[in-house]
Amino acid sequence: MNKNKKIILVAFGSNNLNKSIKRFLFQAEQSKFYDQIKIFKENDFDQKMNNFILKITKEKKRGFGYWIWKPYFVLKVLEESNFGDIVNYADIGCHIIGENKKRFNDYLNILNDENVWLLPFQYKEDYKILNNKYHYPRIEEYKFTKSDLFEYYDCLNNKEIINTPQFWAGSFFIKKTENSLYFMKQWLDIFFKRFDLVDDTNS
C-alpha cells in the first residue's frame, strides 16, 4: 500500500450509544490500523441533514433515519480526503480485532489495484457455516430490496443482480476516486429524491 495514502476509519453513533462508541474507539486505537479515526455523532450533521432526520424520525425510527447518515458521513470524509485515500466504514457495533492485521492488509492490497475503488462484503453461501457454530440464512438481494428500487435503476429483471447475495452495508472499504464520489452521491441523493424507495412502505 502507498505509504502516502491515508487509511481512515469512519463510524457513527447516536447519543444513546456512548458505551459502544468508547469500546469501538478503544479497539480502533489499539489496532493501529488507521491514520485517522472519525466517529461522528448527532451534532455533526449540518442544518439541512439535521432537519431531514428530525422530520423522518418523528414517525419512522428505523436506523436513525433509515441509515442516511452512512452515505452522508462517508461522502463527507471522502470529499475532505485526497484521491487514493481509503475509508473503512464500520458500524459502531462492529469489533476491530488487532490480531487480524494480516487480513486487514490483504484488504488494502486489493484496493491498491488502480481499477478497484470499492471493497464490499456479501452474504455468500461460503459464510453459511463458520466453525460449525454460526448458521446464516440465504440473503439474496430480491428478498430484502424493494422492487421499486430495482425498477428505478432499471435492473428489476436482471437476475445477475437481484438473485445475488446481498451486500452488507455494515462495513466496507472505499477508495477516493471519481467513481467512488459519484457512487456515494447517488446513494445519498436517493434519500432526498425518492425516500419511498428506501423506507418500509409497500412496493
Task: Give the residues covered by each predicted segment.
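Glycosyltransferase catalytic domains, chiefly GT-A lineage
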Residues: 1-203
